[in-house]
Amino acid sequence: MGFDAIVVGARCAGSPLAMLLARGGCKVLLVDKAAFPSDCISSHYIHNSGTTRLQRWGLLDRVRKSGAPAMSRVRYDFGDFVLEGAPPPADGVQEALAPRRAILDQILIEEAVASGASFRESFVVEKLIWEDGRVVGIRGHDRDGVVVEERARTVVGADGAGSLIAQLVDARKYDEHPGTTCFYYSYWSGLPLNVCELYIRPRSVTVAFPTNDGLTLIGQIWPLAELEPVRANLEGAFHQAFDALPAFADRVLAAKREERFFGMIARPNFFRKPSGSGWALAGDAGYHRDPITAQGMRDAFRDADLLAEALLDGSPAALDLFERRRNQDSAATYEMTIQRASFAPPPPEAMALLAALQGNQEQIDRWAGIDAGSVSAAEFYSAENVARIMNDAAGAAVG
């Protein structure tokens, strides 16, 4: 066969996977239908449990130097109270980053090529080549329309939630939940930030954080039921949300929107069976969730790491282990994401716990670490830790 692996999709799951396989001695072909550098719809945010992988791969300094500001703190504004914390480090890395995808993906592609992978952009995969029930290659065409066939021991779909590869192999979906939000964002100048800010309200979430070129991304998330009025007047819908946040609104009024609005609507939640005879899936192709918790790139990096390890091992047992490890790592965040995306009111005891965190910086930092992936939700919400938080709050009130 021509290649050990063909990776279809060259963004934040596919390029790191191709890089790691090439570093492991594999002959790898990486293809993507897009031309690069190019942007794509994205939540942008990489939690520190994702940036730690960039460090491990030797890429964190390059992403830093691209102009994406580091963030070590997150500010959660619930209206009645505010919690601001610094998530604990993940393997020594505390910072989160939110690079523009045209910049990040180009860095990842360049490193894959430098590691030995072959890369073809503007290459459209049309079908898979099968032999005796096993995937053995791809058929597609390049930018000039020339039809090309390439063969490999394994074909990996890293081509997003609507993965063509997943469709062609009929990868089984499970634990599915429909999309329940609409998320729109754009970029503003004149709004300097050095933290990620979230404003959580009953029927909307506003998020703002710095990205490349001195710009700040502002995103608005609404329940899907609000889609039609929101889509009919995006500018008005954003400013209506800002009006409910007076201090933030004043800062936005002094800033300037520099680009059009981008949107993600009713993004589905699902797991897919991530491997079979001659094929595998990585990133959003194998596991997808609502963008409200901004876990996509962190999960894509994780999949690249775990799947590369499994493919380099080469055994069916290693691929089965990849699925189990992916699912175990995703389980708590998946449930948390679905709950937040439902916009269902939190139970009173949950809000009481958050309110009790006020003034307890150590526990605020640990709570912020749940989203960041550096603190276990099970440990934070254990009966022992909850009792400690409530007792500390009661003691502070008496004092």
Question: What are the functions of these language-model segments?
Answer:
Residues 55-106:
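A conserved beta-strand/loop capping segment in the N-terminal third of enzymes
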Residues 66, 229-311, 316-321:
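FAD/FMN-dependent oxidoreductases across multiple families
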Residues 8, 22-42:
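Glycine-rich FAD pyrophosphate-binding loop
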Residues 35-55:
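Conserved N-terminal glycine-rich FAD pyrophosphate-binding loop of Rossmann-like flavoproteins
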Residues 111-248:
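Predominantly flavin-linked oxidoreductase catalytic cores and closely associated redox partners
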Residues 1-13:
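Beta1/beta-strand and adjacent pyrophosphate-binding region of the FAD-binding site
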Residues 309-399:
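C-terminal helical "tail/cap" subdomain of flavin- and related membrane-associated enzymes
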